[in-house]
Structure formats: C-alpha cells, structure tokens
C-alpha cells in the first residue's frame, strides 16, 4: 500500500503561470485574441516555457462556439530552449441556468517538434462557472488528455483539475486567479504538478 501510494503521488512539483491577453470582436460573433504566457516549474525556480497564442473564436449561437489557435512556444529542456509550434481546434458547448453556466469543450491539439514525434491529443474539459456577485465569478473544471497517436494500453495520459475566480475590474479589464493540479496517468512514475496561475485580459472596443 505505501509503495503504491508514493508511486502515484510522491513525484510532485510546483509552478506559477502568468499571462496577459488582448481580445477584440471584429464582426458580430467573431473575436480575435492574443495571449502571452510564461510558465515556471522546479518549485517555481526555473522558466519552463513561454509562448504566444494567436487565435479566433466564433459564436455559432448561444449554445455553441468554435475556435482555432496557433501557439509558437519556446520550451526549456534543460540543455537550452527549443521552438515548437502547436495548433488547437475547439468546439465548446454552453448551457446557462440562471447564475450557473455549464461548459463542455472538445479540443484537438497537435504539436510540431523538429526531429521528434508530433503528438496529437484530444482534450475534453468540463467546467462550471457560478456568479457570486457583480463582476465576480467562481469556477471549477476538470480536463482529460487523450494521446491519439500514442502507443500503450491506454490513450488517457493526463488530468488537469482546476478551481478559481474571475473578476471584472472594469468593462474592459478582467483578472483571473486559479489553482491547477495536473496529474500524469498510466505512467510508472507519474508527475503531479501544482500550479498557481494569474491572468489579465483586456478587451478592445
């Protein structure tokens, strides 16, 4: 029992994520956005990666939204930084029940790495958002990562659980603060990553 427990939860780390994003509605229902982020690991002492997300989202109706995003990112693999390119395709469903909003997102993620495997994942995320007060919302989410072109007995590779708050500072500026617990699964020595993430988002009229 103790051996199994430490094999599952003994390998842990802590990191911090910070990001600034800008978005604008270019036509009715179509938004474009840019998001710059930095992420640390090794107990938040090492810069693990930084990247820029450039994307667009289209609101089909009040229930469905689609999106596409391109992410050039620099990753630190201990011997230096390497450039990777990542592409996302999203389909998100939303159901609003008074002050509670329910979300289900399916994301296809593919990464281009020079001289390496180009992994493709499907990510399924469930999210519940609750309005607490004017401009203040709380949320809880859980996301599952499936390696579509991987090998092994199971394609389920990672879980990302999170909870946090969103606060509208003004009509144009929003802040978010959240905790994430990212756990590798179906691996001999899985890593559990604990993350505190802070984000600022500005909407251009």
Q: Which sequence ranges carry the predicted segments?
A:
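Bacterial Sec-dependent N-terminal signal peptides
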Residues: 1-10, 14, 204
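Outer-membrane beta-barrel domain signature
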Residues: 7-11, 40-45, 76-82, 112-117, ...
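Start-of-domain marker
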Residues: 8-67, 76
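Residues that define the transmembrane beta-barrel architecture of outer-membrane proteins
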Residues: 14-16, 48-50, 83-87, 118-124, ...
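Residues on the lipid-exposed face of transmembrane beta-strands in outer-membrane beta-barrel proteins
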Residues: 20-24, 54-58, 68, 89-93, ...
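Repeated loop/turn-to-beta-strand initiation elements of outer-membrane beta-barrel proteins
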Residues: 28-34, 63-68, 98-102, 135-138, ...
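Transmembrane beta-strands of outer-membrane beta-barrel pores
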Residues: 36-42, 70-76, 95-99, 108-112, ...
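Predominantly the C-terminal beta-signal and adjacent terminal strand-loop region
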Residues: 140, 151-152, 156-205
């Amino acid at each position: 029992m103790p051996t199994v427990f430490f094999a599952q939860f003994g390998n842990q780390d802590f990191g911090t994520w910070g990001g600034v994003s800008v978005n604008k509605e270019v036509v009715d229902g179509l938004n474009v956005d840019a998001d710059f982020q930095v992420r640390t690991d090794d107990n938040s002492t090492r810069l693990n990666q930084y990247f820029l997300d450039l994307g667009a989202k289209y609101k089909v109706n009040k229930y469905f939204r689609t999106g596409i995003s391109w992410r050039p990112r620099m990753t630190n693999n201990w011997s230096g930084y390497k450039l990777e390119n990542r592409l996302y395709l999203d389909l998100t469903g939303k159901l609003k029940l008074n002050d509670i909003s329910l979300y289900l997102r399916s994301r296809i993620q593919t990464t281009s790495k020079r001289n390496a495997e180009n992994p493709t994942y499907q990510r399924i995320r469930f999210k519940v958002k609750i309005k607490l007060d004017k401009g203040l919302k709380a949320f809880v989410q859980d996301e599952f990562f499936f390696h579509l072109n991987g090998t092994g007995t199971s394609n389920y590779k990672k879980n990302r659980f999170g909870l946090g708050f969103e606060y509208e500072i003004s009509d144009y500026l929003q802040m978010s603060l959240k905790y994430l617990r990212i756990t590798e699964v179906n691996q001999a020595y899985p890593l559990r990553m604990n993350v505190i993430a802070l984000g600022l988002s500005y909407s251009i009229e």
